């Protein structure tokens, strides 16, 4: 018996020694490279959601089935829509009740009152290994996060690049805690004690929370923010019940996009023609939408339709601009959309405080030698549903927020004391003016692979040059204000 026990212990010691030697050898091999590992933190929609992910029952979290079709049929909502378009009278509250019934089967993505996922919904691609093992992802799209990852992999090798996927609905602070574990693992795998963080859209909010909670770890070498939501977006004003629909604003929006949108994702020229052909129909729809969002009806619209669909998703609350948050929270408390002391309340107020500390946190990083770069878009109009529809934007996030403080002209206008040659931007009000770049005409995250727009992003993530406007301009052709032409070639803005 003693011999068997001794043999077992010796075998266990040998196995442990071999494992430790293998891990040490891997880390030692990684250390031979001077390449800093890059962790990319993507935005909303980068990772698809599934019910029962990674099981034989994996499927779409939203089911378009007889429940939905029966609701459409039973409510006769299609007939109401046709009457609205024709200019006939439809009672708003009756329509809201019908809309509530039709959308009931689409509520599965909403969270519970504590901001937690309901049911078995999540992502199927939480990869803890490098993108060297996920090369198919790099070719899944020629733009957005796959294109960003691909150019970084081209520059430093896919074995040095990791992608932190997450459920975009969840609280970004909880995501940041998971990111901390992820980065710890990356450091072990790579043999390096620092990483470069490249974040996109909502991912910038996750990184903001990570910096707030874990900056004392001193494990960030540089951080690059792309089209960031870290200071919110005016679309977040919808939580203030600010739903403003103006036909002129919609027409201006379509006209501006038809004139300046370069990518081929959406044909705004054709949409512009359709709007012109059905001008009366559009007017009737806008008039009815304004009835739905009137003071008399908007509470019912929110409580019956909007909030059951997405009102408990923490990350959407965390896209409210800092200065709008208190008023938005007060309005939603009055509406019963959130309760003081609930998990959702605690999560969104916690991130609001973090959002307010971002400047302090980034300055703290800079004092420790961390390189910072902020890239944002402008020259495209914001969605025409709030009072800030005229804001410069990348079609989703306002330039003033993505740049962390730039003063911007309304679409088609000029701003006083402009620092950009075209008169659209005054960057002197940015919190980090010397670390912020503006690209005109590029839609949100349209960093198309094979273009110099994409190469610029890859350069910021992997260069050894100092990340400030002057140093980058001296070392490259990249200046603080750039724009694209009809061939998607980026160059400096001159006028």
What are these model-derived regions, one by one?
Residues 159-166, 170-173, 295-390:
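Alpha/beta-hydrolase fold catalytic core
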Residues 6, 19, 155, 366-367:
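A generic structural signal for short, solvent-exposed coil/turn residues
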Residues 68, 78-82, 253, 257, ...:
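Generic structural signal of hydrophobic/aromatic residues within well-ordered alpha-helices
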Residues 28-198, 204-257, 292, 296, ...:
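N-terminal non-catalytic accessory region
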